[in-house]
Amino acid sequence: SEFTPVTSDLTEKMFKEFFDSSEAAVFTGGPDVAAAFSSLPFDHLLFTGSTQTGKLVMKSASENLVPVTLELGGKSPVIVDENADLKNTATKVMRGKTMNAGQICLAPDYVMVPKGKSEEFVKESETAVKSMYENLKYNQNYTSVINEKHYDRLNNLIEDAKEKGADIR
């Protein structure tokens, strides 16, 4: 990602160390590099990123009939069974949600719990987060949202939820 140059550089370094250039390669850059790269006649192309960019990659790759594997942003629901251990489940869900500030494709976006168990699940989730991170906002060991655009998007979602009556804690 053009938003994480240090991670991209480390990934490139590791690939060069462990793979022959004929097996795998890492290319870094922004949308211009991605557009040029995805129009080349590769045997296969793997893209991880946003749905919007994934559509552009797929379109460019289709010009050369290049098979494409896309790992795109999803909603990652969690369905909690009626017999689930809510404390254990909440801990696992919150660990997944808080990893990298929720900025990974598998971070759960919503949880469906059986009727009558939502309040208990919320309390267990709050306890789980507090046990992992005493303080999220001022924690030097917890990452932040990647950029202002994404920060604003999240704040808009929170405001929309509040306007619709959500209990934001």
Name each model-derived stretch.
Residues 9, 36-37, 92:
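CheY-like receiver
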Residues 1, 28, 48-49, 81-82:
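Short beta->alpha connector loops at strand-helix junctions that form conserved
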Residues 5-6, 34, 54, 78:
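Generic structural signal for helix capping and beta-alpha/helix-loop junctions
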